[in-house]
Structures are given as structure tokens and as C-alpha cells.
Amino acid sequence: MLKNNHTKKLYEKIEKDTEGYLKKAADWSIELAKEIAKKEKIVLTNDHWTVINFIRKFYFKFNITPSMRMLIKSIEKKIGLKKSNSIYLFRLFPEGPAKQASKIAGIPKPSRCL
């Protein structure tokens, strides 16, 4: 419980934009991601983490979030063809795979998201 309170307080203190995206990707941690997911009403599974980790790696390599097409192609390679479609990704991240996963991954809101 103490760790949860600490993470919650940390989340409150960290600088975010008006929509809750971290302003500094360096502030991100796994515990913080879990707290953000909780606020987004998402229980993280291995499939969520596959998407989150891919988005973080892509962002730090190219300094931009991946397009939906890139995300689907990567997920196809990582977790299989049946799960590599936009319908499945929307089940994981109902508010939008790129948008919601980016928020949980601690990177800026994708410029392609409204």
C-alpha cells in the first residue's frame, strides 16, 4: 500500500500536459505506467506491455510515435497475426491504441491524434 501511495503522489507531482501526457519521457517508470493505466481504467496484460514497450522503443529511436500501420505490423511479429489488427488493439486501448498507449508509455501525445 505504501508503494501505491508513493506512486500516486509521484504521479501527482510529475509535470503533465492538460490531457495527462508526461511532459518529460525521462520521468516515466513501470510503476508510473501502472498508475496511469489505472487512471485510464486499463488493467495491463502482457499484450499491453508489448505495445507499450514497442511504442517507447520506436519513440526513442525515431523521436516520433509509430503510425497505426507500423504498430499493427510490429504486433503481428511480436504476438501473432490474430492479434495484429486495429480491432484487437482498440480492445486493449479503447480510447485509441496510439493515443492511450502513448500516454501509458510516458511519451508525448501523437501528433496524428485529435
UniProtKB/Swiss-Prot annotation:
<keyword id="KW-0963">Cytoplasm</keyword>
<dbReference type="Pfam" id="PF04358">
    <property type="entry name" value="DsrC"/>
</dbReference>
<protein>
    <recommendedName>
        <fullName>Sulfurtransferase TusE</fullName>
        <ecNumber>2.8.1.-</ecNumber>
    </recommendedName>
</protein>
<feature type="active site" description="Cysteine persulfide intermediate">
    <location>
        <position position="113"/>
    </location>
</feature>
<comment type="subunit">
    <text>Interacts with the TusBCD complex. Interacts with MnmA.</text>
</comment>
<dbReference type="GO" id="GO:0002143">
    <property type="term" value="P:tRNA wobble position uridine thiolation"/>
</dbReference>
<dbReference type="InterPro" id="IPR043163">
    <property type="entry name" value="DsrC-like_N"/>
</dbReference>
<comment type="function">
    <text>Part of a sulfur-relay system required for 2-thiolation of 5-methylaminomethyl-2-thiouridine (mnm(5)s(2)U) at tRNA wobble positions. Could accept sulfur from TusD.</text>
</comment>
<dbReference type="GO" id="GO:0016740">
    <property type="term" value="F:transferase activity"/>
</dbReference>
<comment type="similarity">
    <text>Belongs to the DsrC/TusE family.</text>
</comment>
<dbReference type="GO" id="GO:0097163">
    <property type="term" value="F:sulfur carrier activity"/>
</dbReference>
<keyword id="KW-0819">tRNA processing</keyword>
<keyword id="KW-0808">Transferase</keyword>
<dbReference type="InterPro" id="IPR042072">
    <property type="entry name" value="DsrC-like_C"/>
</dbReference>
<dbReference type="InterPro" id="IPR025526">
    <property type="entry name" value="DsrC-like_dom_sf"/>
</dbReference>
<dbReference type="GO" id="GO:0005737">
    <property type="term" value="C:cytoplasm"/>
</dbReference>
<dbReference type="InterPro" id="IPR007453">
    <property type="entry name" value="DsrC/TusE"/>
</dbReference>
